[in-house]
From Swiss-Prot:
PANTHER family on file: CHARGED MULTIVESICULAR BODY PROTEIN
Cell location: Cytoplasm; Endosome membrane
Similarity annotation: Belongs to the SNF7 family.
GO biological process: endosome transport via multivesicular body sorting pathway; late endosome to vacuole transport; protein transport
Protein name, per record: ESCRT-related protein CHMP1
Record's keyword terms, sorted: Coiled coil, Cytoplasm, Endosome, Membrane, Protein transport, Transport
Record's bilayer topology term: Peripheral membrane protein
Role of this protein: Involved in ESCRT-dependent multivesicular body (MVB) formation and sorting of endosomal cargo proteins into MVBs.
Ranges in a coiled coil: 13-51, 109-140
Length: 205
């Protein structure tokens, strides 16, 4: 990634991808709300089988929503790292000019010019350090997101409670639906691993 223009192109592409992931996250969030509304209507009609199907759909959309947000967050962290590297390359290129300016100021005894040059140089590195700290915080924060494991039964009960509805048919124990939730979590982990590999390949390109 020694070519600055190529690096900037990669940064632009990753930012675009991150925005696309965020749009997909919003879409999934909207679809989750639609499915929860269908749960409400099905419960009102006493259609518990239908309510269960809609609840499963809502949970799947919620999981997809969180996965998209997680991927977008991780991409943003990669972009921050690449952006920092790009700025370091710019500083590296200007290093020769700064050293030359300092030598000139020292030779002529112009302490004011030397001080101004150092102020400018140090300011660039302060900005770099702030950005690096922000990037590290984003990287750490992205790992705190976890895939929801809300059970179908609890979601149905939540919708019923929100709308003051009585669940006319007894709901089975949540344990009966633990396996689908586990599969959703396993799928999320697989997607995380894939996204990490894609980000690494793109960063090396």
């Amino acid at each position: 990634m020694g070519n600055p223009e190529k690096l900037m192109t990669q940064i632009f592409d990753l930012k675009f991808t991150s925005k696309s992931l965020q749009r997909q996250a919003r879409k999934c969030e909207k679809e989750e709300k639609e499915q929860k509304l269908k749960v409400k209507k099905a419960i009102e009609k006493g259609n518990m089988d239908g309510a269960r199907i809609y609840a499963e759909n809502a949970i799947r959309k919620r999981t997809e929503h969180m996965n998209y947000l997680r991927l977008a967050s991780r991409l943003d962290a990669v972009v921050a790292r690449l952006d920092t590297q790009a700025k370091m390359q710019v500083i590296g290129k200007s290093m020769a000019n700064i050293v030359k300016s300092l030598d000139s100021a020292l030779a002529t005894g112009n302490l004011q010019k030397m001080s101004e040059t150092m102020d400018n140089f140090e300011r660039q590195f302060v900005n770099m350090e702030v950005q690096a700290e922000f990037m590290e915080g984003a990287m750490a924060g992205s790992t705190s997101l976890s895939t929801p494991e809300t059970e179908v039964n609890s979601l149905m009960q939540q919708v019923a409670d929100d709308y003051g509805l009585e669940v006319s048919v007894g709901l089975p124990q949540a344990a009966a639906h633990a396996i689908p939730a586990a599969k959703e979590k396993e799928k999320a982990v697989d997607e995380d691993d894939l996204s990490r590999r894609l980000a690494e390949l793109k960063a090396r390109g």
